[in-house]
C-alpha cells in the first residue's frame, strides 16, 4: 500500500473517531439538550436508551482512534467491525427514513445516515485493501 493511501485510510478513521466521540458524548450526557435544540424534546424517550446508544458511539469512537494510530494490517478485524457498524447505522437510518417514514428528525438519516454511508464506503475499501495485504503477509510467513 502506498504511503498516501495509508495516510488517507488513517484520516478516514481519525475523522470517524472524532465524529463518534463527539456524538457519543452529546448523546450520553447532553441528549435532553440535543433533542431540545432539534425541537424534538417530545421524542426523547427519557430513559437510559439514548445514553446507552451514546456510550456505544463513544466506545466505537475509541476503536476508530485505535485503528487510526495502530497497524492497519494487524487491526483488519477491528476495521471489519467498525465498517459493519457504519453499514448498520446508515442502512437502518435510511430505511426508516425512506421506507417506513418514521424518524424523530430528518437530521438522523439525512446527515448522520448519509455521513455514515460515506464512511462505510471508505472503510470497506480500506478493509478490502488491508485484507489483501494481510493475506499476502500470511502466505509469505508460511
Segments the model singles out, each with a brief description of its role:
Residues 18-27, 45-69, 81-91, 117:
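Core segments of alpha-helical transmembrane spans in multipass integral membrane proteins
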Residues 62-77, 97-100:
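Juxtamembrane helix-break-helix junctions at the cytosolic face
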Residues 117-138, 142:
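Membrane-water interface at the C-terminal end of transmembrane alpha helices
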Amino acid at each position: 500500500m502506498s504511503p498516501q493511501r495509508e495516510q488517507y485510510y488513517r484520516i478516514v478513521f481519525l475523522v470517524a473517531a472524532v465524529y463518534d466521540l463527539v456524538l457519543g458524548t452529546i448523546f450520553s450526557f447532553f441528549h435532553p439538550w440535543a433533542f431540545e435544540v432539534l425541537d424534538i424534546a417530545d421524542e426523547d424517550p427519557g430513559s437510559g436508551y439514548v445514553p446507552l446508544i451514546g456510550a456505544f458511539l463513544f466506545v466505537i469512537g475509541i476503536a476508530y482512534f485505535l485503528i487510526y494510530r495502530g497497524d492497519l494490517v494487524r487491526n483488519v478485524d477491528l476495521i471489519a467491525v467498525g465498517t459493519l457498524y457504519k453499514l448498520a447505522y446508515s442502512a437502518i437510518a435510511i430505511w426508516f427514513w425512506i421506507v417506513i417514514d418514521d424518524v424523530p428528525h430528518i437530521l438522523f438519516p439525512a446527515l448522520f445516515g448519509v455521513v455514515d454511508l460515506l464512511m462505510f464506503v471508505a472503510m470497506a475499501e480500506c478493509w478490502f485493501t488491508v485484507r489483501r495485504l494481510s493475506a499476502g503477509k500470511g502466505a509469505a510467513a508460511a
